[in-house]
């Protein structure tokens, strides 16, 4: 124990310190020297000091006044129990100290052993001979010290304050009183023993001793000249290194200031302190801070307004107060305007995100270079796929596609196979999975497909590679539960799991089922399901974990930011996660727009973002067109027929237009256009036959006769019926016997201009022995066409969203093989994706879509591999109706498609497709296009629709304008499909 002082109160406190276990060698030397000193005393070579009155230990008696010394003079006591107290001698007088100092000059300077009672050895015996046998190690007695200096022991500071005495090494005191000190010579082997416990711990952390030495060296103006010799202390060497490092830093700073002075203007003098401080502040700016300051100094007002959180008031304030010399001054000055600092923060955030995007682009450029180079090389040489069924041969372009997938697999990269519809993406995936099984990568792999294509996938696996063990996870809730129980015992034997989008994202039990597998590849067919990162479905699909992913899509990349960003994050989630937290941060960068952007500037801004996104996606997409790879594919001809509406139909249409002209409501453009489209297609899609009086009678009859309506008031039932179309009311009356007398005459199904045109076309097609596909956007229209076909006596099949999923492929196979079936009725949404109907070569689009790519998907159901006849496509348009405007808009978009050129790896460089837009299988139109179409329909003039129909199609605004209207259509369809899938029976292989 030792005593020291609390520097706040002056109170003496006891501080415990422990010996250093690493100082054993030093202790042994000292014990040997003590023994030698004791021997000399006993032999009479030295005179003993008069004995003290108290025993060994702490002496609290009267203290001898001591000479004022530095902190180095406060030493710790060492007491030898074997030495009697009367033999102790005080060698503190100045004469002996001078003699000792003379002796020290013979060798290197030695650090003094800290001791209040100095142990002095005879000069002739000062150095122990190597042959001398050391005495047994003496026990060290801990004593209390009167010293108030705790720093030399590296004890903790009291109350967080520094010791006023200073650090242990005070070099000016060493010069002044060197004669009064003895140094302990420490050789290389025992150098570490000089450091006490806390110094060892601080040295281990790499911080403590260096910090303490630098603090000590910074307080004193005079420094000790240290010679780097064998006996030099470790602390002295560290202090010198710290001092030299500090001098070098100061020298570098002075050199930079001198260089700035030389580069300054001629009239600037070194005495100009403000300029020097300004230059120092500028040197302290980060790269982004400097770029931000330069932007606010040089940008024009219109450029300022393009940035986020900058309005006219802030822009004017910037122009009035610039230039800003340093970033800090700019921030302080911008506090003078409301939300001025927010504008700076927003621009700094923009610079940060732009830097993130640049780093991502750099990563992708490396991938693009290697992928492009290896893609050219991978087309050379044969590819053996022995697991494919004998007799099944891939086309050359399909082999290239499989080789590309293998290359992406070897590079551990995700991929998007974007071949045009009809080029056999399914077959390429089956062949690729057979290759993985061939090399021992058995999976399991998960394939997620739309409900309408699940049977086609099953058929392709059995046809091309029956050796792959396929599990089809589908069916009702009870059947899926039973299937999950069965699979537990056979999990290791499954190569591929085939399921639908709703199965993956709907029920928690289904999600847990897929988590039980360590999935290798997750493959998504018809990738438009992953083109909207704002949807719940997208977020659910991204939670499906697999080592790698493949996306299949037949549609080209749209100039749509949401779609491109969604695909980017899907393909590059590992890359993006290094730079941003999730997709919302990525989305914010691309969506960041100023509040005052006009349409032109907004389009240019977003086009730049589109170019960036496409550049990122390039290495990961392979896209080929049919006209590039299928030279022998039969031709396809297209025609548009404008038909005259029947008089009652035209009168109904004109009544709707007149009502819209008189109406002041302009918000529901989508609903108004929908009413016009229904009237242009068939009058039964509106309510004209069932008058209000008939509806009252039907309502009263239902409430009187039917249990389902017994608790309802007939007035309320009548009001509900008033919102339905004629065909829906007719179908309701068919359900109940009591209302059968209110059924419509079936001949009304023939009373439309388009049905009359079918009377002209269908007989001619039938005479040629060809088959026909008829597509419609409305299931109600398909109901009317069924009545029409029954009246005319044509055999047909029908497929829409309500068709049981597992019945669909059976219907398709039956239609392709049967010679008696003549017509196939399909809804554009359900029948336009992933099905093969090459037995038909005539396509009739009964009612066109806002998006021409939806109609093109329908065309590709028969214009694809396996087609042997020329394909004829006919679009029916009611003359003088809103459909004329829709057709003009579609022509504009289809013309833009012709301007595309080939890009990397055959991918289309579809930069010209600015106005194209596609959302998850639904028809959709931008808000501005809806307004233009409605205005043209009301005025009856459609000449100006084509001129600038795409102005709002390039960005997110058009998307948001139609978002609410689209959700009203899309959500019920998705829920209905999900409910339908859960009610279907399951199959598993």
Swiss-Prot record:
UniProt protein name: SWI/SNF-related matrix-associated actin-dependent regulator of chromatin subfamily A containing DEAD/H box 1 homolog
Disordered: annotated span: 1-288, 941-989
Compositionally biased intervals (Basic residues): 109-120
Function (record text): DNA helicase that possesses intrinsic ATP-dependent nucleosome-remodeling activity and is both required for DNA repair and heterochromatin organization. Promotes DNA end resection of double-strand breaks (DSBs) following DNA damage: probably acts by weakening histone DNA interactions in nucleosomes flanking DSBs.
Family named by the database record: Belongs to the SNF2/RAD54 helicase family.
Gene Ontology biological process: DNA double-strand break processing; positive regulation of transcription by RNA polymerase II
Keywords linked to the UniProt accession: ATP-binding, Chromatin regulator, Chromosome, DNA damage, DNA repair, DNA-binding, Helicase, Hydrolase, Nucleotide-binding, Nucleus
Amino acids binding ATP: 419-426
Enzyme class: hydrolase
Localization annotation: Nucleus; Chromosome
A GO CC term attached to the entry: nucleus
Biased composition (Acidic residues): 72-105, 187-200, 251-276
Domain Helicase ATP-binding: 406-574
Biased composition regions of type Basic and acidic residues, renumbered to the chain: 124-140, 201-221, 241-250, 277-288, 950-982
Catalytic activity: ATP + H2O = ADP + phosphate + H(+)
